[in-house]
From Swiss-Prot:
Family the entry assigns: Belongs to the RuBisCO large chain family. Type I subfamily.
Other information: The basic functional RuBisCO is composed of a large chain homodimer in a 'head-to-tail' conformation. In form I RuBisCO this homodimer is arranged in a barrel-like tetramer with the small subunits forming a tetrameric 'cap' on each end of the 'barrel'.
Cofactor note (record): Binds 1 Mg(2+) ion per subunit.
Domain of life: Bacteria
Claim: Nucleus is one of the keywords in the record: no
Organism: Rhodopseudomonas palustris (strain BisB5)
Biological process, per Gene Ontology: reductive pentose-phosphate cycle
A Pfam family assignment: RuBisCO_large
Sites where the protein binds Mg(2+): 202, 204-205
Name used for this protein in its record: Ribulose bisphosphate carboxylase large chain 2
HAMAP family hit by this protein: RuBisCO_L_type1
Length: 485
């Protein structure tokens, strides 16, 4: 089945229906060029459908093919523009599923456009009837394509310089409850959290401009809180002002107002769409603003293993698009996140070059062509008692956001912030002293709590609470590569 079965010559363009694998979309001898975009799909064919034909159909329908032969193919450089499925492997331990490797000529894509890239790669093909399910698992983006994108507007290094925070993770909290607070009370939460020791607070994904608190009111009270907290602490502080709105004009207006008020950071939601994200990233670059992206909505298509788009692909696209922060999982929190898979997401965000690593779900080497690094954000169900685990699993270049773990503190918001800051500082000190902070973590925290009542209260309240559920999206790691079909 490794032989090419492409029909050549005039028979290739006879009117009628022809199998995709015979039209040139299956080329097992093809060697991808350095400039090719490569997509790895998990293909689940309908019963009785040949996996080679199903994979060739994915290549065809995501590039130049339609359901029947069209003579106008002869007016194009058809051999060049056809996507080529060159390898199909059975997925380890998943009967009926196949990994299809498909190469696309770079000329098929518009420079610097995630919208155009996604329109081809995840366009109509996901509704193709011969497939039970289809998932985009990973992509190899060539340097020639990567360099057409801006990349993160600010980047990790410059963000740390602006915030004057070095040698430790940044600390944040999402204001809770996310909906219903007045502007004045919202600002009080921001002030207490920042005064207590956090670096950032943030709006949640669905706080925009509602009857109980219009956006301008929120921005004014939040920035008043930031300025007061900076004066009280002597540290640079920030709050993610969510500028997500119904139109680009409204988002630009909100972003400009945030800038006028002196904010160092604004926020957008993934649901605004790829073009809007890139537009806001370009605005942030021009205006020296950090851009935080909340991945609201991603689990509708990233969570299931057999259908949709892997978050590792979304992370790659967002690094290209130009955001500075992205929620990337916590492992130990309340949201989906297999440890190995999550490490792969963090590698995509923070490394200059990603070598293939099947254990972390990375199928391809990925160069980043000096694009700025993207700061991953960990949030959702984390608390001070997990600090040693978070530092070990996620490293130093990360924002740890304790929403409930700050605002739910029994002694109040400022005490919750202090508990998190003291826990982090104690763990960083232990790490820098060469201690085995992972195994000694509970002991280190208990000792720090002896001189910090807020930390003791946090540890007594949440103890070792964790959300230990089996992940639905785990790497299909095989010790040896499967044999090409």
């Amino acid at each position: 089945m490794n032989d090419s079965i492409t029909v050549r010559g005039k028979d290739r363009y006879k009117s009628g229906v022809m199998e995709y694998k015979k039209m040139g979309y299956w080329e097992p001898d093809y060697v991808p060029k350095d400039t090719d975009v490569i997509a790895l799909f998990r293909v689940t064919p309908q019963d009785g459908v040949d996996p080679i034909e199903a994979s060739a159909a994915v290549a065809g329908e995501s590039s130049t093919a339609t359901w029947t032969v069209v003579w106008t193919d002869r007016l194009t450089a058809a051999e060049k523009y056809r996507a080529k499925c060159y390898r199909v492997d059975p997925v380890p331990n998943s009967p009926g599923q196949y990994f299809a490797y498909i190469a696309y000529d770079l000329d098929l894509f518009e420079n610097g456009s995630i919208a155009n890239l996604s329109a081809s790669i995840i366009g109509n093909v996901f509704g193709f009837k011969p497939l039970k399910a289809l998932r985009l698992e990973d992509m190899r983006l060539p340097i020639a394509y990567v360099k057409t994108f801006q990349g993160p507007a600010t980047g990790i290094v410059v963000e740390r310089e602006r915030m004057d925070k070095f040698g430790r993770p940044l600390l944040g909290a999402t204001v809770k409850p996310k909906l219903g607070l007045s502007g004045r009370n919202y600002g009080r939460v921001v002030y207490e959290a920042l005064k207590g020791g956090l670096d950032f607070t943030k709006d949640d994904e669905n706080i925009n401009s509602q009857p109980f608190m219009h956006w301008r009111e929120r921005f004014l009270y939040c920035m008043e809180a930031v300025n007061k907290a900076q004066a009280a602490s002597g540290e640079i502080k920030g709050t993610y002002l969510n500028v997500t709105a119904g139109t680009m004009e409204e988002m630009y207006e909100r972003a400009e107002f945030a800038k006028q008020l002196g904010s160092v950071i604004i926020m957008i939601d993934l649901v605004i769409g790829y073009t809007a994200i890139q537009s806001m990233a370009k605005w942030a670059r021009r205006n020296d603003m950090i851009l935080h992206l909340h991945r609201a909505g991603h689990s509708t298509y990233t969570r299931q293993r057999n259908h949709g788009v892997s978050f590792r692909v979304i992370a790659k696209w967002m690094r290209l698009a130009g955001v500075d922060h992205i929620h990337a999982g916590t492992v130990v929190g309340k949201l989906e996140g297999d440890p190995s898979t999550t490490k792969g997401y963090y590698d995509i965000c923070r490394e200059d070059y990603n070598p293939a690593n099947l254990e972390h779900g990375l199928f391809f080497d990925q160069p980043w062509a000096s694009l700025n690094k993207l700061m991953p954000v960990a949030s959702g169900g984390i608390h001070a008692g997990q600090m040693h685990q978070l530092l070990d699993l996620l490293g130093e270049d990360v924002v740890l956001q304790f929403g409930g773990g700050t605002i739910g503190h029994p002694m109040g918001i400022a005490a919750g912030a202090t508990a998190n800051r003291v826990a982090l500082e104690a763990m960083i000190l232990a790490r820098n002293e060469g201690r085995d902070y992972v195994h000694e973590g509970p002991e280190i925290l208990a000792k720090a709590a002896q001189t910090c009542t807020p930390l003791k209260a946090a540890l007594d309240t949440w103890k070792n609470v964790s959300f230990n559920y089996e992940s639905t999206d785990t790497p299909d790691y095989a010790p040896t590569p499967s044999v090409s079909m």
